[in-house]
Every structure is written in C-alpha cells, then in structure tokens.
Amino acid sequence: MQQHTLHIAGGVARNPLVRLSNPVTLDFLDGEHIAIVGPNGAGRSLLVDLLTGKYPLRDGVLTYDFRPSATQTAYDNIKYIAFRDTYGSADANYYYQQRWNAHDQEDAPLVRELLGEVKNEALRQQLFGLFRIEPMLDKKIILLSSGELRKFQLTKTLLTAPRILIMDNPFIGLDAATRELLFNVLEKLAQLASLQIVLVLSMLDDVPSFITHVVPVENGVVGEKMERAAYLRTFRERDAIRVEADAASFGELQQRIMDLPYENTNFTSDEVVRLNKVSIRYDDRTILKELDWTVMRGQKWALSGENGAGKSTLLSLVCADNPQSYACDISLFGRKRGTGESIWEIKKHIGYVSPEMHRAYLKNLPAIEIVASGLHDSIGLYKRPHAGQMAVCEWWMDVFGVAGLKDKPFLQLSSGEQRLALLARAFVKDPELLILDEPLHGLDTYNRRRVKKIIEAFCARRDKTMIMVTHYENELPATISDRLYLKRNR
C-alpha cells in the first residue's frame, strides 16, 4: 500500500473566519510533488494553513505519515516558506527605506551567524555544496542578492531535515537566470527520496516540470488533485475562452481611465529625471557607477537588468528615499536635489509601488484607508480625507477590482489583493510620474492582464510619464517608448 504522507478527509476549520467554502478531502502520496494553484483570494493560503495543522478541525480528520523521519510531529516535518517579493517575507523589524540606510546595514547579521551551528555535518556539506553557500557565509544578510537570499532561506530551512517542504511563490521577483537556477536546484531536491515538495503558485508559467500533480483552488473550493499534464491542458482551454470574454470588459475599463480630465498643474519642466555621473556604493560594493540618465515628460521607460544590478537603488534615488542622493548630481522635476526642496514636494508628483513598500506596509487599516494614504504619501493614514477624496479612492479600487474589499482590514487580504490595493494607492492622486517596481508581483493570470491594460490606458493620457521594472518581458505595456538595462557591477 502506498504511503500517504498527508491525508485529510472532510476537513473543516473550527474557526469560521478561516474556513474554506467546502470541506477538504485530499491525499499527498509519497513520491508526489504538488503544486497548489489558483487566483488571488481563492484560498490557497487557507488550504496550506489547514494542511499544516495551524487551524484545529471542527469536522473531519487530518493524519500524517512522515516515515522515514524519526519524529512524527507536523512541527518537525512540515516547513513552510512564503516569499512575498525579491527579499522574502516581511518581518517585524523591517521598515521602508531600510535598504538604503548605511547604519542599518552595519547592524545586519552575517549569513554565518544566522545559519548557526549545524549538528548534521553530512547534511550541511550536501546543502552547502548544492546551494554554493561557502562564498556567502561572511556577507551581511541585508546585502545579499535576491538569488543568494533565496538560496540562504532554503538552506536554513532544509538544515532542519523536513519531510515536506512548502514554498509559497518561490520564483517571485527573480530574474530569468536566477529563476532557472532555482528551477534546477528544486529539481535536484525533488530527487531526494526523503523530501516532498509543495509549491503554492499564482502563475501557470511557474509550475516546474518536476511537479507531478496539481491541486486547483478557486472561490474557496479545493478541487480534485490532477496530474500535471491534464491540469495544464484544462487550464489553457479555459483561459483561452476567458481571454475572449475579458476583451470587451477591459476595453470599457480602459475607456473610463482615458476619459479622466487632464490635470497637470504641479510642474512645468519637460525634464522629469536627470542623473549626471551618479555612483552609489555600499561597503566595498559599487551598485551604480557613473550613471547618466534623463527621463523626459511623456516617456515610458522599461528599466531592466539582473537581480542586484541596482534597479531598486536607482528608483530609490528618483523617489527621494535614498540618503545618498544628496551627494549626487540629481535633478527631479527640474530642481536639483539639495536646493531646499522637501521630499514631500518631490513625492507629490509620483505614484509608486514596489516590493519594499509592500513589505513595510503591514498596517491593519481598512483597505480603502491604505489607498487613501497615497494622497499624502504616508505609510498609514494621518490626515482624514474628505468625502470627495474617499470617492476617488473607491473609484480606483473599483478599477483594480477590489472595491468590494474596501472595508476589510488590509492584513486579512491575500497577498495578491494587497498588491491590487497598493496599486490603487499608486494611481489615486493621478500622478505625473508613475513608478512601478514589479507591479504584477504575486498576481494571477487574470489580474496580470487587467493591471497591464490599466497601465496602458493610464500611460496613453497626455503628459503621463512612467518607469517600470519587471523580469518578465510579456508584462511590459504596449506604451513603452524607451529602455534602460543595468548590468551588475561584479
């Protein structure tokens, strides 16, 4: 009889706030590698929490068989890592702008210190060799590239020798080369007889070839486990039908945005951004070296490059978040930095969303207040908007498909729903300059198409300027007019 590493039958959470729509019945068999897939807000994370025993059951049964593990507790044998962006999950000590402040980097621990003492020397050697950890040991954790950090996080988790490893969005924020590296590493891990891999994904493209089965989740309903090939075939057929159906509604959505009135009373300069021989260093590493770059009003830039090339650092200069900008020759909206302007005078022109902002913005306010904070560029809502401003906030939430969540606490939204709310926040003041750093992070196929259409319509309006970062070429809107590719300084 085949070993059932995990078995749940008729499972219903005791707490009604975390229940899925239907009772859950599901089996994970030894040798299977599973992908849990579904749209934003479908219930994927709730399913994982149920399977890992986080929520006690009101009805049903949940059992495990972790052989050959020496222990049989879920705590020892199931490890869960959720990746929200390039740099992992938010933590309580993280704050916006932390990456750009040198004194925070000085206090950051080394990789060696975080890995600690390893009791199983054979396992340590195997993992350090697989992930090439040795060259990273004396680096500060906050200065790791995204690929290095992903390898560190996996190594630290795997050193506990789990029987089941669950990873939520493991490929998020990675460039093509780093995604391929991670694919290859996971493929090697999948060959270990003692490890079962479960991936929680929102993008069909991220289902690797070593995955044997797929569990679909939609509207809180957990579907039947399917073989990978059968699921992909079914999904593509359904998606082709939906693309046709969405075309008309997306057209109407774009027209609503195109019909917005022209308002450009905040600045008159044709030059939006100018960098002259700008260099940025952290410790002994040069991030940007003598960079010249000019962005003119109405241009739409695609900013690209491998992980660690300095894209987010460059955007931090444009957004007035990086203290090193005062020592550089930088002009924003026609004014040279350091000539008396406040950061708020700069930010009032900018609508911005980024992984760093998402990590820092863990405020348990109603979602509409998160959107409203974009009117004043604050992390949190400290100035009460008037009724007209709140109506504008709700309008943009409707555009992004999350108006129905306006009163729901932000931290109770799924990661994808949070991203949509933060996108509405970036657009809410109808900014002259839109800065989108990986805006489609964690969004499902439908919402990625929807947001791309919104960006295209917004950028087609008079005098709108945009800078967008993405590692997926197919995410770029058709309105892109210029490109800047950054190479990593080795």
What does each model-found stretch correspond to?
Residues 37-39, 304-306:
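The feature captures the beta-strand-to-loop junction immediately N-terminal to the Walker
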Residues 119-136, 387-405:
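Conserved ABC ATPase "signature" region
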Residues 140-144, 148, 382-385, 409-413, ...:
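Conserved ABC ATPase signature
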